[in-house]
Design a protein with these regions (language model features):
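Charge-dense, extended regions
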Residues: 133-169
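Polyanion-binding interface signature
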Residues: 1-137
Length: 169
């Protein structure tokens, strides 16, 4: 979540990373549980096979945010381990602004910010993950995102019943 607060991208550079730059890590266990969720023709456990077959190192789609904005997104990096938007700051700014971080930007390359997202901060908001879904189960190029209540990911991975927010009923 806090890629924007990392060291400069280029060794020796003094340029701070773009404000709000973020990606969400995707645990390998998720792809083991639901390997074909993103697209039934793609096995997300087989990154090397996907790369060899398509010549691509990421899966591209449109990510729909709760505020109605839509950004190009990818599931990328080795073994499909990250969710990113183009620009990377779109995902980050949505997360940070929702959690009360109004200016996710380092002032200097050699001084990290104190205003980062931690598990404690997420817990104060009752969150620890995001939920993704297809509004149309046959449209694999459009995915919706929103925050998930604390514990949702663990319940999902254990096939336990999800707690539904009263506002969603």
């Amino acid at each position: 979540l806090n890629a924007w607060n990392g060291n400069p991208k280029t060794r020796g550079s003094q340029r701070v990373r773009p404000g709000g730059e973020a990606y969400l890590p995707i645990p390998k266990d998720l792809w083991n549980k639901c390997p074909f969720w993103i697209n039934p023709s793609i096995d997300m456990r087989d990154y090397a096979g996907y790369k060899q077959e398509t010549g691509q190192s990421s899966y591209k789609f449109n990510l729909h945010f709760p505020n109605g904005k839509v950004y190009p997104a990818i599931i990328g990096q080795a073994n499909f381990k990250s969710l990113e938007t183009k620009p990377q700051s779109a995902l980050g700014k949505w997360i940070f602004n929702s959690l009360g971080v109004e200016h996710p930007q380092r002032e200097r390359y050699d001084e990290p910010s104190d205003d980062i997202i931690t598990m404690d901060r997420l817990m104060r908001f009752g969150l620890d993950s995001v939920k993704l879904w297809h509004e149309d189960p046959n449209d694999y190029k459009n995915v919706w995102i929103d925050f998930a209540e604390y514990g949702s990911f663990e319940r999902f991975m254990k096939d336990e019943m999800q707690v539904q927010d009263e506002s969603e009923e």
